[in-house]
């Protein structure tokens, strides 16, 4: 399940209440954003773990303060967070552009970490 974020406060609450979060900063008018949206939905369905790994979408035109806070200059931009702090996954803290292979690999990595956390490892 993808969390559709409507305010920066809502984003901050998700970041503080969930161990790992993948955030997709997008715009409705952005063709690459539309192209990767189904992939992002599939990754969310496959890897989401309640309170451990969440996938969120932030529309940069509607939640401008969040876009500014994280320095979003291109869409889509994907960022990864652990315990509220931005982190690198597979050596990348940010993925700019619709790159399904890199995004999929990052989701797989976080999904594995989330499963280990649930298992108590």
Swiss-Prot record:
Keywords: Allergen, Disulfide bond, Electron transport, Redox-active center, Transport. Disulfide bonds join 30-33. Coiled coil: none annotated. CDD domains: TRX_family. Residues 2-112 form the Thioredoxin domain. InterPro entries: Thioredoxin-like_sf (IPR036249), Thioredoxin_CS (IPR017937), Thioredoxin_domain (IPR013766). Signal peptide: none annotated. It comes from the Eukaryota. Participates in various redox reactions through the reversible oxidation of its active center dithiol to a disulfide and catalyzes dithiol-disulfide exchange reactions. Belongs to the thioredoxin family. This is Thioredoxin-like protein. It comes from Fusarium culmorum.
